[in-house]
Each structure stands twice: as structure tokens, then as C-alpha cells.
Amino acid sequence: MSTADRTAPVTVTVTGAAGQIAYGLLFRIASGAMLGPHTPIRLRLLEIPAAVASLEGVAMELEDGAFPLLDAIDISDDPWTGFAGANVALLVGARPRTAGMERADLLAANGPIFTDQGQAINAVAADDVKVLVVGNPANTNAFIAMSNAPDVPAERFTAMTRLDHNRAIAQLAKKTGAPATEIHRIAVWGNHSATQYPDLTHATVAGRPARELVDEQWLREDFIPTVQQRGTAIIQARGASSAASAASAAIDHIHDWVLGTPAGEWTSMAVPSDGSYGVPDGLISSFPVTCADGAYRIVEGLEVDAFSRERIDASVAELTAEREAVVELGFAKG
């Protein structure tokens, strides 16, 4: 492709850009895995001041990759600079949970971060910005950012449950012996937390209903808790949280949002509710969605049985409590 044939670069901002998830993410973005093989990228890397020196090293490695699609790399510790002109914003950085910290403490610690980032996105990001929050608690951090960006359409703010979706696919593939490519229409509902509900009700394996291939005991006592607790299991096994798999899921999320889901397929994204399936309006909750033309739509009309209803309601209750907590703390409006 000649220089004259190249499209204008897409500006991609990544926060927490010196961290482990970003390290697994940035090189794949630069390679074209996220936005396709013909889309040039301008990377804006955002970090806290103490991590900028480390980030310089990451930028050097990106340069050394000589990626044909990587037009430019900018480094900043200022959100108002880092989000300038952003078409895609991946909010990876967040205050991690430390020993003795309750979930309420985590919400209080992350509130100012996502308030500032939401305000910066509102002021300086591109008109077509798409936001994915990866940093936990992702759903509620996304709600805070969205609440502080009143001029950006609410549907542009999403949180990542694609990692949970991919984990669910992997567990079903392992159980049935089918390749992941033969598994379709899994759904993840609710919060990206241990209350999430990975749902096989409508899933298929090589065209057969998944529920015909697995027993109820495995579903309830193995599959669901394994997916819910997978992050904890990885921490216990490797002594660090999921990084490469989280990065891969972020790539998948943006790729499908921008370029579309395959015909007849859906994925899982945490998006502002429109009231579907009894989830309160505006709550950022995971749903099965389809994507086309740069937009997502919640899959409509799915049957929700009593077991699923109970699981969805439990996760939504947790999200509602988190929303009430950040409203009370002054980070968002109810």
C-alpha cells in the first residue's frame, strides 16, 4: 500500500500503559489485530508521573517493532493531553485492590481517577470516541467515567466482560472436546465480578444445544463457579493477576465493536442498560450483544428461566449497590 492509499490514522489512547495488561495489549494494537490490517494507528500512552520512565521503555520497544501501521507514539501523564483526539480509549489503569481493602474502599480509591478521565474524554476526545474500561471494578468505573462525560453519548462507554465470555467458551470447549470456534451464543450477564452469570441457555456446540451435552450438576457446580472464580485461580497459580488473557479480550471487544460480530453470532459486553431484561436504565451491566457498523445492540427476546433470573438479579443487585455507593461519594449522579 502506498502512502497515498493509507487512511488517516486512528488515535488510540491506553491508560495504565506501563502496566502488565497494557504490555500484552500495545504490540497487538500496533500489529493491526484490533482495528484490522489496513488501519494506521496513533498511540497515546497515558500513565501516572511515577511510571513515565518505565513507559519510555515500552515506547522504545514499540518503535523497535517497526510496525507498518504504527504512525506515532505519544506519552503523557496528563489526561487532557492523553485523550486529545482519541477515537478509541482503553482505560486499563486503575487502583488495584490491596490486602484488607473492601470493595467500597476500592470504589473510593478509583472514583477520582475515572472522574478526571471522564471529564477529559468529554472535553478533548474525538466526536466518535469509543471507550472500554478494563480497570476494576470495571462496570462501576465505566459508570463514573460516563457520568462525568455528559456530552458523549452514553452508549460509547463500555466495560469488559469479554474475558469472562472467553473463559466460558474455553470451559465449555474443554468439557465437550469441541474447538472454541464451534462454540457460539454464550452470554455473560451482570457485573465483572464473582456474581457474574455465564449462561449456556442459548449456547451451541457444533450446532447442537450446549445444554444437551452437559449435565445440570456440571453446569451449576463446576462451569459457573469456575468462570466466576477464574481470575482468583490465576492469581493463586501464577502469583499475579490475568494480564495476557485480559489484553487479548480487550482486543476482541474493540475489534468486534468496530468491525462487527460474525453473522448469527453474538458476544458479551458491559453496556449502559436500556431497561432490557429488567436491568435498570443506565446501569452498566453485561449483556449478549451483536455489533455492526461500529455500534452494538443488546440481543432481544431471549428466554430467561427462573434459575437465570435469580443469577442475573443477584449480579444486578451488586451493581446497583456499587452505583449507589459512588453516587453517595459524589463521583456520579444517580
Curated annotation (Swiss-Prot):
Residues where NAD(+) binds: 16-22, 110, 117, 134-136
GO molecular function: L-malate dehydrogenase (NAD+) activity
Catalytic activity: (S)-malate + NAD(+) = oxaloacetate + NADH + H(+)
E.C. numbers: 1.1.1.37
Alphabetical list of InterPro entries matching this protein: L-lactate/malate_DH, Lactate/malate_DH_C, Lactate/malate_DH_N, Lactate_DH/Glyco_Ohase_4_C, Malate_DH_AS, Malate_DH_type2, NAD(P)-bd_dom_sf
Record field: transmembrane: none
Residues the record marks as active site: 192
Family in the record: Belongs to the LDH/MDH superfamily. MDH type 2 family.
Protein name: Malate dehydrogenase
Gene for this chain: mdh
